[in-house]
Amino acid sequence: MVKKKTNNDKGKEVKENEGKLDIDSESSPHERENDKKKTEDDSLRATESEETNTHNANPNETVRADKFSQEESRPIEDSPHTDKNTAQESCQPSSAEDNVINTDITSLNEKTSTNDEQEKGLPLKISEGPFTISTLLDNVPSDLIYTCCEAYENHIFLGTTTGDLLHYFELERGNYMLVSQTKFDAESNSKIDKILLLPKVEGALILCDNELVLFILPEFAPRPNTTRLKGISDVVICNFSRSSKAYRIYAFHAEGVRLLKISADSLVLTKAFNFKLIDKACAHEETLMVSKLNSYELINLKSSQVIPLFRISETDEDLEPIITSFNEQSEFLVCSGGGSYDSGAMALVVNHHGDIIKGTIVLKNYPRNVIVEFPYIIAESAFQSVDIYSALPSEKSQLLQSITTSGSDLKISKSDNVFTNTNNSEEFKEKIFNKLRLEPLTHSDNKFRIERERAFVEESYEEKTSLIVYNNLGIHLLVPTPMVLRFTSCEESEIDNIEDQLKKLAKKDLTKFEHIEAKYLMSLLLFLMTLHYDHIEDEVMKKWCDFSDKVDIRILFYMFGWKVYSEIWCFHGLINIVERLKSLKLTNKCENILKMLLMMKNELKKKNKTGLLTNDFDDIMKTIDITLFKLRLEKKETITVDMFERESYDEIIREINLHDDKLPRIELLIEIYKEKGEYLKALNLLREAGDYISLVSFIEENLKKLPEDYIKERIADDLLLTLKQGDENTEECAIKKVLKILDMACINKNDFLNKIPAEETSLKVSFIEQLGVQNSNDSKFLFNYYLAKLREIINQSNIWSILGDFIKEYKDDFAYDKTDITNFIHIKLKHSLQCENFSKYYEKCENLKSENEKDDEFINFTFDEISKIDKEHILTLLFFPNELTNWVSSEELLKIYLSFNDFRSVEKYIGKQNLVAVMKQYLDISSLNYSVELVTNLLQRNFELLDDTDIQLKILETIPSVFPVQTISELLLKVLIKYQEKKEESNLRKCLLKNQISISDELSRNFDSQG
């Protein structure tokens, strides 16, 4: 916790009285005032009650522990407590209250006295601490030594060292009768090791002498026809399945872990795990903390991972392993000790990864059993005592309390049952009721409500516990001391103590009485933070807001002296500290009141959305609203409507109209008019201010709420005016909004487009871009505009020179497989900042061309227009890389691509008629190496053209004598082979033809001779 400490002068007045506050005294200022009225008779009271019926709650209404009852609005100014001098006089401490320490000592004596009274007639002695003891059952057989104790509904079950099982039943509240006393095994006196209740299947597992038997509840007798499991060292619950209505149980055997499934009518072995020699265990689903051969281990049954940990005893002394759950999700608590039970020990919290967390808790002796009742650890000593330690490593002294006995060893147990303590005295309960009843801070004669609040505390009061301390002298409840009696100091150190306690309460399900106590602690925490912190506008105010659903935040307004609407109530035990805080000048603790109020407002609005706040939310908000508005108006700071509630609007408008600065507050006024449904007034304000962007946004957001006459007659003019007043940065957004509004208002967009003046070319282009092209004329209009922009950019940005550099770079690259010239220029343009604007409009033209690719007229139009500004065919190549044949001959295209050294594109136009010519041009390249590579690639990639003898000979003739033949020897060989194959094929054909003619002549002669 961060506490800001300063010594500035403005906090001096606050500091003077800090040490003089006490929480509780004999009577509150309101009680002292009401003493004057004690002589009034009952009939007058009844009359007053009827007269104040607006303050009385419905008698049939259910009173909830977590919600304050609400009263009719009553300003503080009407209360006698608003007189500051009177309040200060009533808050002056008496001589007995000169410092807070006296209060603490008195409280401590009261606690000790309470414990002393409890010890009378009890066989236990308990030191001062967070728990008290209360006898549950004192007539157990004293000749037995008990090993375990469990409770189920109205039944108590005991196990002993001699194998006895005792069953007690509660006949009436606090009166138990021994129902049965039987032996686990009639032939054995072995001790009962464990009673594990399975309440959801009305069963219990009894472990005795390594034998596990399933009992039925509440009869507490063995279930018939159920297998007895032998060789079991320990048994723990894995979980309960709601679907199968069965418990999954781990039973630990020397030969491994058995997974049992126990339902109301069966016990089934479902699985076995090969983890042997486990003595004791605790389970979190598939994660086990186990003891084995004087050491602890973590086992994950799902992954079969084993994490060895540390030894149970530093020596080979046979100490019983201590394993329990620190919390039910991810942490275990184990103990490690020295050589014996009387030597010191450590309690260690270990997570599922085997890491020791939360520090080390030092125990004075090695325990026989440990229960975690966070934030306490209750240890069963081997020396007839139970020791209670703090589970918080920050505690200076971790040993908080001890319980001793004159009987046999004390045992501890945490039962499934929750018991209610009924043994406290009326004086003790009266003290609690007096502290926790609510009393009005603003003066009220609502005596019925006051009595009802006290009755509510009395009805809610209960002390519950599931902790049991027992031995042969009886069974006793270990009861936590009521929190309201444990926190009585006004010292600053109490803040941390209360915060720790509230964190603990947040982790458990609270009873109705615990809810009341929690609210009391929250109130006390807020008052102490307000008292001791030098600056309260941040952390303290945030805490007030966090607790606003439990503590009436109007108490804070009361302490600041602000006007408070409706009646506010506070715990009687805290009235004095509230009144004395009110006498201090708390504004000295705030550096920025505005910031504080705004933070509170925002936090409370969030809370209100969850439905957690009271019905007085509107009264709380109104107090803050007007204060915030006036302070901000004085400082000329920004004011927004989300700072105010609807009830404050009219007053805020009046405040603004009192000043001449209405227009600077236009946003606030517009938002207020919107909330009030006066939309045309808001439009007029925006029009007068010339804020057309906000105007169109307002129309879009509120179109359905605007009058029909405005939409028919005025809306188009406002929208057009908005577009004409916009700039390039806001134009696109404005047009989108206008188009959306036109759709919403069912206004024809072309009609609106025709209203745009001819001189507003740029606006018309932007509108068509957003609207989308409707016809060919729109396309031509846009293309001419884009092309004009391109021409302008080319001239202004020296684009031809830049493109020339790109082309030179491309031509100087003689790699045959390089990309084509069009793609190369695209890439260069994309990465050139100088060409960014050129690329922008090029893409617009290209997109427009693509959208109209099936419109031949438009495509021809674009080619003609681009050709007018083109140089060296660069633009036509960019725009029409695949369509140029529509306007340019193949021969011309070949020349164009050859001029750029675009070798791949050249191939598209190569044939037998020009192959040799292209080859000659490649040979003319100055570098022989490049020429060789180009010619080689040319011939290889066009080998299919070399099927003619003439062209083969021309190729061979064209190759110069200086040409390194070895580089194309393979290619030449293929040419020669192809030539030879063709020659041989020709000769073969001639020979075959000659033979065929000869055969034909022979057949003809034979035919003639026969005829």
From Swiss-Prot:
InterPro entries: CNH_dom (IPR001180), Vam6/VPS39/TRAP1 (IPR032914). It is found in: Cytoplasm. Residues 1-48, 63-86 have a biased composition (Basic and acidic residues). GO terms for cellular component: CORVET complex; cytoplasm; early endosome membrane; endosome; fungal-type vacuole membrane. Residues 1-100 are annotated as: Disordered. Keywords: Cytoplasm. Residues 143-418 form the CNH domain. Residues 87-100 have a biased composition (Polar residues). One of its GO terms (biological process) is vacuolar acidification. Signal peptide: none annotated. The keyword Cytoplasm applies. The keyword Cytoplasm applies. Required for sorting and processing of soluble vacuolar proteins, integrity of vacuolar morphology, efficient segregation of vacuolar material into the bud during the cell cycle, acidification of the vacuolar lumen, and assembly of the vacuolar H(+)-ATPase. Present with 2270 molecules/cell in log phase SD medium. Belongs to the VPS3 family. This is Vacuolar protein sorting-associated protein 3. It comes from Saccharomyces cerevisiae (strain ATCC 204508 / S288c). The gene is VPS3.
